[in-house]
Each structure stands twice: as structure tokens, then as C-alpha cells.
UniProtKB/Swiss-Prot annotation:
Gene that specifies this protein: lacB2
Source organism superkingdom: Bacteria
Protein name: Galactose-6-phosphate isomerase subunit LacB 2
Pfam families documented for this protein: LacAB_rpiB (PF02502)
Subunit structure, interactors included: Heteromultimeric protein consisting of LacA and LacB.
């Protein structure tokens, strides 16, 4: 399976471990970054993963930031993405079987690496089980998404990166 993976600078090592694990399981990885611990902003990498999945370049995605909250919210803003922030297998399986989630999010500083791998395995193995009811839920959720042309601008996040550079954000 082709899987897009992305993170912010706080959890680069955790992302590398996930990428390495997924490769040992035979998956093809699109590593959307970040690649080091240089301060950056999680929406950039959530957007990259979301776009890879929504375009069909990747089948599914994994996003990781310190708590998982920010990057999961960011990836959910990409039209066509249904992402779930999870910390257990039950939630991961539910998100796929009932809501047809195509991206899974983690707090890399909240959850351990071995558990994260187990949850990813459960998510990848789960299959969407369409029903009339969950089709309606998904249709409703998808109708809430509206693409903004501003998002196509490669400088969309520049104002936030400039604030990072000035030290206005703290980890």
C-alpha cells in the first residue's frame, strides 16, 4: 500500500520510526516531511499529506505532531480528507469501518512507538463497511469542505513561518 506520512519538527524521530516500520511491512512511503528538527509549522505537513491522499498519489495517510491535535485538524481542512486523531485501536478501526477515514493522526509525544505501530496496523487492516446511514454521515461531512484558492499559494503559511523565525511560537 502507498502511504503518505508527515510530521512537524517536534516528532521527526517518531515519524522516521513509523516510516521505517511501514517499509518493513512492505508499504511504499511518500515522506512528506519534515526531515529534521528545525522549527516549522505542522499545517504545512498536514496539508502535504492531505493533498497526497486526496489526489490519489497515496492510498492512506499518517500525520504526527506533539499532541496530534494540530496536524490532524490541519489535514482535515484538505477537501476529500477524513482524518481521525486516535490513541487506541478501537477508535482507529471505527474511523475506517464507519467513517471511511483516509488519514490517521497521532500525538507522537503522547503515545509510544510500539503502540502507534499496532494502531497503524489495525487501521490499515480495517475496511470501510458502507451502510446507508454512514454514507449519509460521510456525505454530510464532505459537504462541509470548501476549497480556498489561497491554499494553492506556495506562500500560504509564510506569515506563520516568519513568526516562528522571530521566536513568537514556543514548543
Amino acid at each position: 500500500m502507498k502511504i503518505a506520512v508527515g510530521c512537524d519538527h517536534i516528532v521527526t524521530y517518531e515519524k522516521i520510526a513509523v516510516v521505517d516500520y511501514l517499509k518493513t511491512q512492505g508499504h511504499e512511503i511518500i515522506d512528506c516531511g519534515t526531515y529534521d528538527n528545525v522549527r516549522t509549522h505542522y499545517p504545512i505537513f498536514g496539508k502535504k499529506v492531505g493533498e497526497a491522499v486526496a489526489s490519489g498519489e497515496a492510498e492512506l495517510g499518517v500525520v504526527i505532531c506533539g499532541t496530534g491535535v494540530g496536524i490532524t485538524n490541519a489535514v482535515n481542512k484538505v477537501p476529500g480528507i477524513r482524518s481521525a486523531l486516535v490513541r487506541d485501536m478501537t477508535s482507529a478501526i471505527y474511523s475506517k469501518e464507519e467513517l471511511n477515514a483516509n488519514v490517521i493522526g497521532f500525538g507522537g509525544k503522547i503515545i509510544g512507538g510500539l503502540l502507534m505501530n499496532d494502531i497503524i496496523d489495525a487501521f490499515l487492516a480495517a475496511e470501510y463497511k458502507p451502510t446507508e446511514e454512514n454514507k449519509k454521515w460521510i456525505e454530510k461531512m464532505d459537504s462541509l469542505q470548501h476549497a480556498s484558492q489561497d491554499q494553492n499559494n506556495p506562500h500560504f503559511f509564510d506569515e506563520f513561518l516568519e513568526k516562528w523565525d522571530r521566536g513568537e511560537y514556543h514548543d
